[in-house]
């Protein structure tokens, strides 16, 4: 298993529209995709993702998370769990049209990180 350079950083926000305006209008980031729960801004080599705070274990108490790209998410998840890394979600994103699969873990101090396997080119 090889964890590759972070492809994204997620920032958990309480006021999505306020943060969206800040990153888009003040910092000049280009908005790529969005929903009511998240906004992606494309950056060279990756993206910044704003996530609306909710009751999920991944977002309830932390303000950010890092996502690492892997080639085979099933093998990577199995290996991380074998190494004693705490898994806090099953593999998600396995729906028709999905661009990626992902799952979440906690590091030694409880910080959340994600591993992602891209099914389609994340740039387009």
Give the predicted meaning of each segment.
Residues 37, 53-54, 118:
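Residue-level structural signal for beta-strand termini and adjacent loop
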Residues 1-18, 47, 64-66, 119-124:
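N-terminal beta-strand motif that seeds the catalytic metal site of vicinal oxygen chelate
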Residues 19-21, 79-87:
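Short, positively charged
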Residues 47, 56-57:
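Short, surface-exposed beta-strand-loop junctions and turns on beta-sheet-rich folds
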Residues 10-48:
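Core segments of cupin and vicinal oxygen chelate
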Residues 42-44, 51, 106, 116:
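Residue-level detector of conserved, well-ordered beta-strand and adjacent loop positions
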Residues 2, 6-14, 39-42, 57-124, ...:
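Vicinal oxygen chelate
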């Amino acid at each position: 298993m090889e964890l590759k350079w972070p492809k994204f950083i997620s920032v958990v926000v309480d006021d999505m529209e306020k943060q969206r305006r800040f990153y888009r209008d003040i910092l000049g980031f280009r908005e790529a995709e969005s929903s009511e729960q998240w906004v992606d801004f494309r950056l060279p080599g990756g993206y910044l993702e704003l996530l609306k705070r909710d009751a999920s274990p991944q977002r309830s108490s932390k303000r950010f998370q890092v996502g690492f790209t892997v080639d085979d998410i099933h093998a990577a998840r199995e290996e991380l769990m074998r190494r004693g890394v705490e898994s806090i979600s099953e593999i998600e994103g396995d729906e028709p049209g999905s661009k990626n699969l992902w799952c979440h873990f906690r590091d030694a101090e409880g910080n959340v990180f994600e591993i992602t396997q891209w099914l389609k080119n994340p740039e387009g």
